[in-house]
Swiss-Prot record:
PROSITE patterns the UniProt entry points to: RIBOSOMAL_S19
Name by which UniProt lists this protein: Small ribosomal subunit protein uS19
Biological process annotations from GO: ribosomal small subunit assembly; translation
Primary role: Protein S19 forms a complex with S13 that binds strongly to the 16S ribosomal RNA.
Gene: rpsS
Keywords assigned: Ribonucleoprotein, Ribosomal protein, RNA-binding, rRNA-binding
Keyword Signal appears in the UniProt entry: no
Species this protein is from: Aliivibrio salmonicida (strain LFI1238)
């Protein structure tokens, strides 16, 4: 269920400060964050945000289409390696 419009978007304060500082200075270095729950807002456009996936920081370049989504949606936490092959079928 989406967040109420009355409440507005949620973004961690420490991340918001880093974003505003990067926009103000024009810095293009990735912003490291562990805040997967923060929503992408219009001031983040054209910034690279390194989102933690539990093991490493995944660089996410923010575009207009991503506004309203959460940062964690673009940094997958699980790797799918495929199902185990049937050993009997390979021997034939």
């Amino acid at each position: 269920m989406p967040r109420s419009l009355k409440k507005g978007p949620f973004i961690d304060l420490h991340l918001l400060k880093k974003v505003e500082k990067a926009v103000e200075s024009g810095d293009k270095k990735p912003i490291k964050t562990w805040s997967r729950r923060s929503m992408i807002i219009p001031t983040m456009i054209n910034l690279t945000i390194a989102v933690h996936n539990g093991r490493q920081h995944v660089p996410v370049f923010v575009t207009e289409d991503m506004i309203g989504h959460k940062l964690g949606e673009f940094a997958p936490t699980r790797t799918y390696r495929g199902h185990a092959a049937d050993k009997k079928a390979k021997k034939r």
